[in-house]
A protein has these predicted regions:
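Nucleotide-activated donor-binding/catalytic signature segment of Leloir-type glycosyltransferases, i.e.
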Residues: 237-244, 359-380
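Conserved acidic donor-binding segment of nucleotide-sugar-dependent glycosyltransferases
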Residues: 430-449, 458-463
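Short, structured helix-loop element that forms part of the nucleotide-activated donor/catalytic region
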Residues: 340, 345-372, 465
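Short hydrophobic beta-strand element within catalytic cores of glycosyltransferases
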Residues: 415-418, 422-429, 435-436
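Aromatic "clamp/platform" in nucleotide-sugar-dependent glycosyltransferases that forms part
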Residues: 398
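A short, well-ordered alpha-helix in the C-terminal region of glycosyltransferases
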Residues: 440, 451, 458, 465-480, ...
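Conserved donor-binding/catalytic core segment of Leloir-type glycosyltransferases
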Residues: 305-336, 347
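Carbohydrate-associated surface elements
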Residues: 274, 295
Length: 500
């Protein structure tokens, strides 16, 4: 354990964090840190859920604040490292109960019912790790389900997929048993964190708030559709557009986790109104929904404000080097602009540790295009220093919520060119104004390097337009996205759920 364990028996607010704070830099982690530090009168607990312990051996970027009294970490896929079970499988399992639990999950996915408060899913579909690895009843049940599958995948792939789905749930049971008592549960996502929150809400009889920074099920669907680790055979037998059974099984699993969390949540917070239809489609109830935009400490970015002529001929993409940020489109955009004879430099500012394979692919692309002299991977840097220097920031993502990097750019008076994802259109053009009336940058389609290059060039080549966007950016962030506004909204929310 890189972080010291803290073991208080109670907490005012228990944060349930999957793959974010304190190990991974990014917008959600920054939000977590600011929530903890913004409420010094509250005592916090943290349950961190990671993938495998080996993924978190590097330094910890976020030290625990003094008002964090409980900290525990669990690694969801460490159970996969061992084939030996430490306990004993039961001689007979209630196959009907297991079957009913799976039917209940399917009904939940179809929106046909709600899970019982005492759902067997809380006990991992009624199957312990020892049962899964050592029970003939579980083996026979898996065989029965397998023969019912149309266009069957290889059984070995089916078995390991099902085991991989169950393994994190066995780990979550440990977190469930060890968690401290708390007044409020707060999870910034559905997924495993939201699922654990739903179970804890029932066990501790306390309210769960899900504060979504992106639609977890949507992002996992994108990841799974792009994933190369899911083995697919007989691809030529599938209809066009048909998703392989195992890939769809994973998608359904994460959709179920999301619906389960939505059902048990007292409040479901979103960052902007445009995401509400997706939340409703995912099983949220309209009466639970609440919009609280991100906010930042605007004053801290004032020193970065300066006119275009005092800035370097550079644009920056501030974000993690991961597929969902579509760094490759940014690199291809740099290539198009370099072909025009521009001397602009393109900075990629963010951690490359989360997906080292993708980072390597991006580096190969830079070398293949001969862009080593103008595309630079800077790693983590002071955002204030970067925003003091660059002329534009760029967001090439294929999915976002309400990106903190855009708000920080605005606070520094730096216009933004962004893909049309999440709240970015609302941020750049304003929620109530007509498109182009008071722009703080330019919106472009996803995965469109020519459009991205044209937008960057349009702002770099027109100082008057750049200055107009810069002024609009500052006005918008100062009036609508102040950190103090966000804190006040959360303070009211905490008080409301505590008294209901």
């Amino acid at each position: 354990m890189l972080m010291e364990r803290r073991t208080a028996a109670t907490a005012d607010i228990l944060l349930l964090l999957e793959g974010t704070f304190p190990y991974v830099r990014g917008g959600v982690s920054s939000w977590v840190q600011r929530i903890i530090e913004g409420f010094p009168d509250r005592r916090f607990g943290i349950i961190f859920l990671g993938s495998a312990r080996s993924d978190y051996r590097r330094s910890v970027p976020y030290p625990l604040p003094a008002n964090v009294d409980y900290y525990a970490e669990y690694f969801l896929y460490d159970e996969m490292d061992s084939t030996a079970a430490t306990g004993t499988a039961r001689s007979r399992l209630d196959e009907n109960a297991i079957h009913d639990a799976h039917l209940e999950m399917k009904a939940c996915l179809k929106g046909e019912g709600f899970l019982r408060q005492d759902s067997g899913l809380a006990e991992n579909f009624g199957v312990t790790r020892e049962d899964f690895l050592g029970s003939s009843d579980v083996w026979n049940y898996l065989l029965q389900r397998y023969v019912e599958i149309p266009d069957q995948p290889a059984f070995v792939d089916y078995f390991w997929t099902v085991r991989s789905m169950h393994a994190p749930l066995w780990t979550l049971e440990k977190a469930l048993r060890a968690a401290p008592r708390t007044k409020i549960l707060l999870a910034p996502s559905t997924g495993y964190a939201g699922y654990l929150g739903a179970l804890l809400a029932a066990r501790l009889n306390c309210p769960l708030i899900i504060s979504e920074h992106g639609i977890y099920t949507k992002e996992r669907r994108i990841d799974l559709l792009l994933a190369r680790w899911i083995h697919e055979d007989e691809e030529f037998l599938r209809r066009p557009g048909q998703i392989h059974y195992l890939r769809q099984l994973w998608i359904d699993f994460f959709e179920f986790l999301g619906r389960f969390a939505y059902q048990r949540a007292r409040r479901i917070v979103n960052l902007y109104g445009g995401v509400i239809p997706l939340q409703l489609e995912g099983g949220a109830v309209e009466g639970k929904l609440l919009t609280i935009p991100n906010g930042i400490d605007v004053e801290s970015f004032v020193p970065a404000r300066r006119p275009l002529v005092q800035r370097q001929d550079a644009v920056a993409l501030i974000g993690r080097v991961v597929p969902i940020k579509d760094i490759k489109t940014f690199i291809r955009t740099a290539d198009l602009l370099r072909q025009e004879g521009r001397k602009t430099h393109f900075w990629i500012v963010g951690s490359s540790e989360e997906d080292e394979e993708y980072h390597a692919e991006c580096q190969v692309l830079v070398e293949h295009l001969g862009l080593q002299d103008c595309v630079h991977f800077l790693g983590f840097r002071s955002v204030l220093e970067i925003l003091s220097a660059v002329r534009l920031t760029v967001l090439s993502s294929i999915s976002e919520g309400l990106p903190l990097s855009v708000l920080e750019s605005f606070a520094a008076g730096v216009p933004v060119v962004s893909t049309d994802v999440g709240a970015c259109r609302e941020l750049l053009y304003g929620a109530a104004s007509a498109e182009g009336e008071a722009p703080a940058g330019i919106i472009v389609p996803i995965a469109d390097p020519p459009a991205l290059a044209a937008a960057i060039a349009a702002l770099l080549d027109d100082e008057e337009r750049w200055s107009f966007c810069s002024r609009n950016a500052v006005v918008r962030v100062e009036s609508q996205y102040q950190e103090k506004q966000m804190f006040e909204r959360y303070r009211r929310l905490f008080e409301e759920v505590s008294t209901e």
